[in-house]
Amino acid sequence: MRLTKQLIFGFICLLFPLTAIKAQQHNRFVKPFIGTDGTGHTFPGPSMPFGMVQPGPDNRDYGWNHTSGYQFQDTFLMGFSQTRFSGTGINEMGDVLLLPINPKKEQGKNSYDKTSESAKVGYYSVTKNDGVKVELTCTQRVAFHQYTFPENVAQVLVDLQHGLRFVFDPNDAKALVIESSVKIENDHTISGYCSTDNWVK
């Protein structure tokens, strides 16, 4: 009986040599914009399994179609927040909104052309109408932003009061941020925190 099992195993190994097995790149089939239209409640930004951050674009901070902060049909941009729920159908998080702007072009700082937007596994980019290119990626615990400005002048707006509100009327203001602080460390570093109160405590 033992010899029979060894022969069967040997025959199977001959049929499927281990050297012929190659790793496949299945991430080429992933389309991050699926579910970002209508009531799909997803966003196209990068994320990691069980990650602490999900950086991405925020078009609006309230309403049923914007529970992840993003809606594919929109071309208005509030900025790029660092956390969100994707696919749950509930507005939540949207913490620490950043908006890079070109101060020489006031028009276009909050809008973009859909043809400039792209996403793939672990990466999102868009070029705003003021010429600023935004690229996002992340690790398990850190969101990385890279901004490319068309001129020698660059500004980044930091909004610690922003959050994805679980309301359907923009006039139904609900305070999400309990406490916040931001400190400019140097020309390349800011630090801070915000403590929020919403569905997730």
Regions of interest found by a model, annotated:
Residues 1-24:
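Bacterial Sec-dependent N-terminal signal peptides
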Residues 24-201:
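Accessory carbohydrate-recognition regions in carbohydrate-active enzymes
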